[in-house]
Regions:
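Short polybasic/polar patches that bind polyanions
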Residues: 130, 191, 203, 237
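Secondary-structure transition/capping motifs at alpha-helix termini
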Residues: 88, 103, 130-139, 208-210, ...
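A penicillin-recognizing enzyme superfamily signal
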Residues: 1-87, 92, 96, 102-107, ...
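Short active-site loop at a secondary-structure junction
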Residues: 75-81, 104-124, 138-140, 171-172, ...
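Mid-domain, small-residue-enriched loop/turn segments at the edges of structured enzyme/sensor domains
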Residues: 155-160, 192-231
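Extracellular glycan-interaction surfaces
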Residues: 127
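Conserved catalytic neighborhood of penicillin-recognizing serine enzymes
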Residues: 135-198, 242, 252-283
């Protein structure tokens, strides 16, 4: 109510007019009038003329009178959300929610929608580093400002990403760095492996959207669909094997004769060990990182009333969960990818346009926008034992050579405690 350009932020009226006009040109009303042979002047006149219409509201459809152009702006006020859930072992899609009301919002955000994915892309980078460099979740890297030099890895200018809140200065294990989405550590990993292997891995995991060969993909700058992301994350849960999502397993006639049956399309992508170590990293997100709200009330509960902000909080899950939050620039998109051994579920929340976003990171982060949907969905799924959703831990490989227990003084990458620092320096860190 206090924003005169609502629901947009950081836009001038002229920019808003352009945005609304572009949306109008993509509308069904515009398409039908063009097919009918109407010229632009006539079409624009119709968009500015008040007419009776039925519009969506959270209290049910309501009849009103407004111009079609005003109705476009009205609908921009609503946050959109989508969710997809699949069994990573079979590829069978268990749930698909492309939006909250198909009658008024005829767009499938799961398959058609492509949005910046933020830090949910980081596991592809970490998995590449683990697979190529044999890094352990316990390896320690400096959390300090780091730049990839100009003309390196496809970059024209120097790339010097900053951490959220501009906080630096400590050494972090890989597990802690991913759990807390530390950008400087991601930059160091990207400098070591380069964008090409990360892109190659993402492609094998079912990512078909455009991925620029530049270091900044480490922070999730590409636009990718939720459909692609859920399929890709399933590779981690399925011991490194990608299974293409399946919506229809078979078709039978009225007599039960099978007319069509899908043969799952699978690709060996990662070693079982690399996939498991990546899953172990992602478990850290819900144990001590940005997804800890799934477990218990936050440490800063006394200073910030999450119950007034996050629906259904606290959730108090006790079982092993691997996951990753994602938040994009200006809090325009909130993501949460969550995994248990036999179910991978992804959630995206955001405005129809990136100019519709939260001002405050507390409201606009993936842990606030998307994680609650995942939590309430999973809580409901666990209340139905017949679904068989796993409460167990992810199965470890028979031979695990990469240390994952960071509480033990186990040699890391075959090195003892004394020469561990020298080894990391030898790798270029």
């Amino acid at each position: 109510k206090l924003n005169p350009t609502a629901p947009f932020l950081d836009l001038r009226e002229g920019e808003i007019d352009t945005l609304l006009q572009n949306t109008a040109r993509r509308s069904e009303r515009w398409r039908k009038m063009r097919v009918a042979g109407e010229n632009e002047e006539t079409i624009w006149a119709s968009f500015k003329k008040p007419v009776p219409m039925e519009v969506f509201s959270w209290k049910g459809d309501r009849d009103t009178i407004m111009t079609p152009l005003d109705s476009i702006r009205y609908y921009k006020h609503f946050l959109r959300a989508s969710m997809m859930s699949m069994n990573p072992l079979t590829g069978h899609v268990k749930a698909w929610v492309g939006g909250f009301n198909y009658k008024h919002f005829q767009f499938d955000q799961v398959y058609q929608g492509r949005r910046q994915i933020g830090s949910t892309f980081k596991p592809f980078l970490y998995a590449t580093a683990i697979d190529q460099l044999r890094l352990s979740p316990c390896d320690i890297l400096p959390d300090a400002l780091f730049c990839i030099e100009p003309m390196m890895h496809g970059n024209v200018d120097a790339w010097c990403p900053k951490n959220s809140g501009n906080k630096y200065g400590q050494m972090r294990t890989l597990k802690n760095a991913l759990a807390n989405s530390v950008n400087t550590v991601s930059a160091r990993l990207m400098d070591k492996v380069g964008p090409r292997p990360v892109i190659n891995l993402a492609r094998k995991m079912g990512i078909t959207s455009y991925l620029p060969r530049v270091p900044s993909i480490a922070l999730g700058t590409p636009d990718i669909s939720l459909f692609e992301m859920v399929g890709a994350y399933s590779t981690f849960a399925n011991k490194g094997i990608y299974v293409k999502p399946i919506m229809i397993s078979r078709i039978e006639d009225k007599n039960g004769t099978v007319l069509f049956e899908v043969v799952p399309e699978t690709t060996d992508v990662l070693s079982e060990e690399s996939a498991y170590v990546t899953v172990d990293l992602l478990k850290g997100v819900t144990e001590s990182g940005s997804g800890i709200r799934l477990r218990h009330q936050g440490a800063d509960e006394a200073n910030y009333a999450y119950k007034n902000v996050v629906t259904g909080y606290p959730y108090q899950f006790q079982n092993p969960i691997a996951g990753k939050t994602g938040t994009t620039q200006n809090q325009s998109d909130g993501w949460f990818m969550g995994m248990v051994p036999n179910l991978v579920t992804g959630v995206w929340v955001g405005g129809d346009d990136r100019a519709v976003h939260f001002e405050d990171i507390a409201f606009g982060q993936g842990a606030t926008m998307a994680l609650p949907i995942w939590a309430m969905y999973m809580r409901g799924a666990y209340e139905i034992p017949e679904l068989g959703i796993s409460l167990e831990d992810f199965e470890a490989p028979e031979k695990l050579t990469i240390p994952i227990d960071c509480q033990q003084e186990t040699p890391i990458n075959g090195l003892n405690k004394e020469n561990k620092k020298e080894d990391l320096e030898g790798l270029g860190f």
